[in-house]
C-alpha cells in the first residue's frame, strides 16, 4: 500500500504518495490547487492537481468524475496527459499530469510573438481541437491560460473541467468573456463545437496583435466590440440563435459595417488573416472546422494528414444523464482510479537527461531543484521543422 506524505501548500493540506517530492505551488483556482513535483520513478517533473472538496456536493463530485474520465479517454500529443491518479486518506482526488514550463497567457504578456511562433502554435491548437471534437467533446473554456507550452514550442491544451458533450440544449455560463462565442452570449443553451473554433480564433488574433481582440468589460460591451469588427449579425442568424429577449435587443442595435481584417492586423500574414476570417464568423454553421482549418494555406508548412489523428472512440457521456448521489459518484470515481492503475497510462514514461535552461523570462517556474527542465519533447517534428532563429529566440 502506498505511503502518503502530508504537506501544507498555500494553507491547503496536500497528501501525496511518497513517489513525489519537492512540491511547489503553481496555481490556485476555484476547483483545484496545482503544484509542481518531481516523480522519483520516471525522474520527470510533473504537475499534481488537488481537486478541491470533490465530495462536498453532487455537482462537484460529478465535475470531478467528468474530468477524470476525460483525462483518461483523451490521449493526444496536444492535450495534457494523465500519468497518475490517486485518492488520499482524506478522500481528496489528485491528478498527475505533464508539467510544461509556461502558458500562452504568460508568454503573451512577456514579449511579442514572432509570426513563426503564431503559426506553429495555431497549428498545434487546431490539431488538438480536431482530436477533441472527433471524440464528441467540446472544451468550452479555451483561453491562453489553458494552453501550456514548453521550451521546445510544444503546445498542450489543458483544463477539461467545463468540457461537455455536444447536445441540443446546453448550459450557458462557459468560457472566459474575451473568448466567448456570440451564440453563447445570445442564447445561453444552444451551441456546438463551433464555440471552440471561435475561442481559438480569438486566441490566434491575440497572438497576432499582442492583446485581446474583444476585451469586453461586460456582456453588452463584449458584443459591441464584436460587431465593431464583424458588423451586425445577419437577421437569419440572430433569428436562429437568439432567444426572444436577445433577438429584440440585437435588432435594435445601430447598424455597423464590418471592419476590413487587414486594418485590424496591418502587419500580419495574409493567410493568417484569411484563416481568422473563417474562424470568427457570426454564423456558427459557417465557421470552419478544426479539421478543415488544418488544411488552410496558412498552416501548409506543418499540415500532415497522416499525423493529425482523431479519437478511436467517441467519449461515453451516458453518466451525465443520471442524477447520482454523492456516495454513488464516489464509488464511480474510485472505480475509475482502480481501472487506471489496472490499465496504466497509454504511453511508457520517457526518461531524459538534463539540459540547458531556457530564458527565465519565458518560463519563470520551469526548473526543478536539480536544474532539469520540467518538460520533455512532445511533437518530434517540431525540432525538425522549427528553424534555428526560433530556437535561438527561446535560447535553447
UniProtKB/Swiss-Prot annotation:
One term of GO molecular function: protein serine kinase activity
Residue ranges for motif TXY? 171-173
> In which domain of life is the source organism classified?
Eukaryota
Phosphotyrosine occurs at 173
Notes on how activity is controlled: Activated by tyrosine and threonine phosphorylation.
Q: Does the keyword Protein transport apply?
A: no
Q: Does the keyword Lipid metabolism apply?
A: no
Q: Which cofactor does it need?
A: Mg(2+)
- Protein residues bound to ATP: 26-34, 49
InterPro entries named in the record: Kinase-like_dom_sf, MAP_kinase, MAP_kinase_CS, Prot_kinase_dom, Protein_kinase_ATP_BS, Ser/Thr_kinase_AS
- Protein kinase domain location is 20-299
Phosphothreonine-modified residues are 171
What Pfam families does the entry give? Pkinase
Question: Which Enzyme Commission number(s) are listed?
Answer: 2.7.11.24
**Keywords in alphabetical order:** ATP-binding, Kinase, Nucleotide-binding, Phosphoprotein, Serine/threonine-protein kinase, Transferase
Query: How is the protein modified post-translationally, according to the record?
Result: Dually phosphorylated on Thr-171 and Tyr-173, which activates the enzyme.
Q: Which family does it belong to?
A: Belongs to the protein kinase superfamily. Ser/Thr protein kinase family. MAP kinase subfamily. HOG1 sub-subfamily.
Domain description: The TXY motif contains the threonine and tyrosine residues whose phosphorylation activates the MAP kinases.
PANTHER family according to UniProt: MITOGEN-ACTIVATED PROTEIN KINASE (PTHR24055)
What job does this protein perform?
Mitogen-activated protein kinase required for growth on media where sorbitol or mannitol is the sole carbon source.
Protein name listed in UniProt: Mitogen-activated protein kinase mpkC
